[in-house]
Design a protein with these regions (language model features):
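N-terminal amphipathic, basic-rich helices that act as targeting or association modules
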Residues: 1-81, 241, 245-247, 252-256, ...
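Long, well-ordered, tryptophan-enriched scaffold segments
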Residues: 4, 175-319
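Structural signature of the thiamine diphosphate
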Residues: 219-287, 407-412, 431-481, 549, ...
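Glycine-/acidic-rich phosphate or pyrophosphate-binding loops and their flanking alpha/beta elements
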Residues: 261-264, 296-297, 314-329, 345-351, ...
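Cofactor-binding active-site loop characterized by glycine-rich and histidine/acidic residues
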Residues: 42-163, 332-333, 337-338, 346-347
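Peripheral docking tails and interdomain loops at the edges
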Residues: 301, 306-312, 419-421, 440-441, ...
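Generic long, charged, amphipathic alpha-helical segments
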Residues: 359, 515-516, 521-544
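Non-catalytic terminal/interface segments that mediate subunit docking, oligomerization
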Residues: 66, 271, 279-390, 396-406, ...
Length: 624
């Protein structure tokens, strides 16, 4: 690469000739498409901010000026321009670059990221600290129009506008226009008001007028009011200015010259600025431009066709299909998503039942409380949400769901390890935090068939809030003798075994394989699978009380998790044997393939066998 090979830091971006910048953008897009096609990741959003990222690093001095990317999934170009091009081919691979911003990876990454609508709050905090430290550097938040549907973003805008801090919020508008403007005059003024010369002239004029004895201040105030009235004739909305921001734009987000001029102008304003830019999501790759949602987060794909390498079914798709089947017979079923209809498998439901489908935007808290209203009205709401995003609505689950004794279903997708999306997306906390909420029932099916049984039980044989958690990806093979009744628990193997493996969810497949291998070596081992992990069946606990050893394996956080509760219940009932819990300790889990993470935490077949064999031949059959 002629230009990327030379860029070791943002300083090298500043040294390029202006005519070279479009060629740099072209190289970056080639690298983005090629790398994501091999590693998977977020493509459309990154293709849309190439020119913006170049302009940011050309105008500002990162990391002294702090660029904060909302969600962080669109920071690939940022990584390329901050010295990480040589390692970029490792992105989302174990031991390689993160798919999101990561401060441990680079000083140019200000925060760990992955969740939406946080950037303005973070940038306001940085800007406030700058003010307290008399630091003249700038805090910049880059947020998309999608993330602006999150309530946290509006809380931050409300506070930032009143703060008077030196803060720049860049609104990357690639789907909708926040404020519809009128005609060519508006477009001309948008460009004019973004030029540095405009702000220099404005500042000098205000300074001269304010020096006029007696009447200077009044003249300045009247001119400001007149300018505002004229602007309001041209612009329909002054929402951001009403909040206290200086509004600039909209600007062509793919014109580097205009972007640089606008950013230079924004730097000169000693007040919060909102720079509104228009971009094309997926720009430069036809398949992504035509179907940006499908290329938002994508697995490995064929560059020439745009088709994913793997296109089979998965838990999300099976959930979506089955929910459509139920909804066709039961008019009470409603589906709710927080801007994740594709990811959660609800796209088919959206098309078939548009009157009972609700995309609330990035507003998980609202989704739960909205569901409570639907439930109060006699409907059966099913809110599909990734485990990691369920964290955002804990209070609503408590106050507006469980406390109200309302019947609603939470479809907890991506439960457990999610792999390459990494530290901010691992679904390792939900079982533990749901475990502490009174009145909630939690199921954890291990196969597609069990998933369907779980939803039937949740919808027609349960009360209150019911959560059904299932992993990312495909089901794992289970023994043919697997009990399909989906009672609160099931046993694989002999009831009189000296050693029991206890687990739930997808780990059941690994547990059965481990048990079979240990039995072939002469060990007396069975598996107890918890289908309902909250409340745990007392009969399930009684089933293992006479064992010598119980090994609990859990794909989640150890503290407060299901294994801890199971251990406590056994102790209360007088268990005299040895208990071992293998789970995730008090730590966040890095990005790597799911198989690698299961191996690292001793949660796959080999890990289970090794853990059990570390105990001196306990559970081995007596030899004749």
């Amino acid at each position: 690469m002629k230009y990327l090979d030379k860029i070791k830091s943002p300083a090298d971006v500043k040294n390029l000739n202006e005519d070279d910048l479009p060629l740099l953008a072209q190289e970056i897009r080639e690298v983005l498409v090629d790398t994501v096609s091999q590693n998977g990741g977020h493509l459309a959003s990154n293709l849309g901010v190439v020119e913006l990222t170049i302009a940011l690093h050309r105008v500002f001095d990162s990391p002294k000026d702090k660029i904060i990317w909302d969600v962080g999934h669109q920071a690939y170009t940022h990584k390329l321009l901050t010295g990480r091009y040589p390692e970029f081919e490792t992105i989302r691979r174990e031991g390689g670059l993160s798919g999101f911003t990561n401060p441990s990876e680079s000083e140019h990454d200000i925060f760990y990221s992955g969740h939406s609508s946080t950037s303005i709050s973070e940038a306001l905090g940085v800007a406030t600290a700058n003010g307290l430290n008399n630091d003249k550097h700038t805090a910049i938040a880059v947020i998309g129009d999608g993330a602006l549907t999150g309530g946290l973003a509006y809380e931050a805008l409300n506070n930032a506008g009143r703060s008077k801090q030196r803060l720049i919020v860049i609104l990357n508008d690639n789907e909708m226009s926040i404020s519809k403007n009128v005609g060519s005059v508006a477009r001309y003024l948008a460009v004019l008001r973004s030029k540095p010369g405009y702000f220099r002239l404005k500042a000098r004029t205000e300074k001269i007028i304010n020096r006029i004895p007696l009447i200077g201040k009044k003249i300045s105030e009247q001119l400001f009011k007149s300018k505002t009235r004229l602007k309001n004739l041209i612009y329909k909305s002054t929402f951001f200015e009403d909040l206290g921001f200086r509004y600039m734009g909209p600007i062509d987000g793919h014109n580097i010259t205009q972007l640089c001029e606008a950013l230079e102008g924004a730097k000169m304003v000693n007040a919060p600025v909102l720079l509104h830019i228009n971009t094309v999501k997926g720009k430069g790759y036809d398949f992504a431009e035509k179907s940006p949602s499908e290329f938002h987060g994508i697995s490995k794909f064929n560059i020439n066709t745009g088709e994913p390498v793997y296109s089979g079914t998965n838990f999300s798709a099976e959930f979506g299909d089955f929910l459509c089947d139920i909804a066709s017979k039961d008019k009470r079923i409603c589906a709710i998503t927080a801007a994740m209809s594709l990811g959660t498998g609800l796209e088919k439901f959206r098309k078939q039942f548009p009157d009972r489908f609700y995309d609330v935007g990035i507003a998980e808290e609202h989704a739960v409380t909205f569901s409570s209203g639907l439930a109060r009205g006699g409907m059966v709401p099913v809110f599909a949400v990734y485990s990691t995003f369920l964290q955002r609505c804990y209070d609503q689950l408590v106050h507006d769901g469980a406390m109200q004794h309302l019947h609603m279903i939470i479809a907890v997708d991506r439960a457990g390890f999610v792999g390459e999306d990494g530290i901010s997306h691992q679904g390792i906390l939900d079982a533990a935090f749901l475990n502490g909420i009174p009145g909630i029932t939690v199921y954890s099916p291990s196969t597609y068939t069990e998933l369907k049984h779980a939803f039937i039980r949740a919808i027609y044989h349960s009360n209150g809030v019911v959560a059904i958690r299932y992993p990312r990806g495909t089901e794992k093979p289970v023994p043919e003798s697997n009990d399909l009744s989906f009672e609160p628990f099931a046993v694989y193997g002999r009831d009189d075994s000296d050693t029991f493996i206890v687990t739930y969810g997808r780990l059941y497949s690994y547990a059965c394989s481990a048990a079979d291998e240990l039995i072939s070596r002469g060990y007396n081992v069975s598996v107890l699978k918890l289908n309902r992990i909250k409340p745990i069946s007392e009969d399930a606990v009684k089933r293992v009380l006479s064992c010598k050893k119980v090994f609990f394996f859990e794909e989640g956080i150890k503290a407060g998790g299901i294994g801890s509760v199971f251990s406590e219940m056994m102790s209360e009932k007088g268990f005299k044997g040895n208990f071992n819990l293998t789970a995730v300790d008090n730590e966040f889990v890095k990005h790597a393939a799911v198989s690698a993470l299961l191996s690292e935490y001793s949660l796959d077949e080999n890990g289970m066998i090794k853990t059990i064999l570390e105990y001196d031949d306990g559970g081995k059959k007596d030899e004749a």
